[in-house]
Regions:
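Bacterial N-terminal signal peptides that target proteins for export
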Residues: 2-14
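Non-catalytic macromolecular-recognition regions in eukaryotic signaling proteins
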Residues: 25-217
Length: 217
């Protein structure tokens, strides 16, 4: 039986299979999965290579949920409110060609066209001594982020913003030593520039949340 040559439509179908498989990886802690897109045989991939939570100029996974008043350690007099704000994360996204690509294949710049953040309580559940470990509602934003072909870009994004901290406190979250552990998962929607296809990729990182004392920082 004579074999039919692979047509342009066949190549496109092959690309779609690769595209679907590459876009369905699961997230992992302190980094994440990747996704790929492109045009027919030319495929470019985007990966979340690291997520580093940061607050008040320091890399930390300890999220302070409640703002306290700082006091003089000798007199006990109130000296002012402790430093407080959004807890962010430095997220690194790397744009690379598909592993089977050659040096002559076209490489695409990729644009993040939006992302969402969701929260889950980590394995082990709520500590027995905790007064509460409420579910946390995530958020979605249409922020655009460009990642040139062959390069990595690090951006500072909201990790646990003030709105989520307030939600945790108002819902009765633990504010003592029995701090619960959650994971924040970013789901990015990306598009190779000049191509109509979009794909998603994920990355997650764990954090502990309670009423941490940041006076003196």
């Amino acid at each position: 039986m004579r074999r039919r040559p692979m047509t342009q439509q066949g190549l496109k179908g092959l690309f779609l299979v690769v595209f679907i498989l590459a876009s369905c990886s699961s997230p992992s802690d302190d980094g994440g999965s990747g996704g790929c897109g492109g045009s027919e045989a030319s495929i470019t991939c985007l990966n979340v290579t690291s997520i580093v939570p940061t607050s008040l100029g320091t890399d930390t996974t300890n999220v302070d949920a409640l703002r306290d008043q700082c006091r003089d350690p000798v007199s006990g007099a109130v000296t002012g409110p402790e430093p407080f704000g959004d807890h962010n994360a430095n997220v690194t996204l790397a744009n690379t060609q598909f592993p089977t690509s050659t040096s002559t294949d076209r490489a695409f710049d990729i644009m993040i066209i939006g992302y969402s953040v969701t929260y889950t309580l980590n394995q082990g559940g709520c500590p027995a001594a905790a007064r509460g470990c409420p579910p946390l509602t995530g958020f979605t934003t249409g922020q655009s982020i460009g990642i040139p072909a062959g390069q990595a870009v690090t951006v500072t994004l909201p990790f646990v913003p003030l709105s989520v901290k307030n939600q945790y406190v108002q819902a009765g979250g633990e504010l003592g030593i029995a701090a619960p552990s959650y994971s924040a998962t970013y789901t990015f929607t990306a598009q190779p520039i000049g191509v109509n296809d979009t794909f998603t990729l994920q990355g997650s990182s764990q954090f502990t949340i309670t009423d941490f004392n940041n006076c003196g920082t």
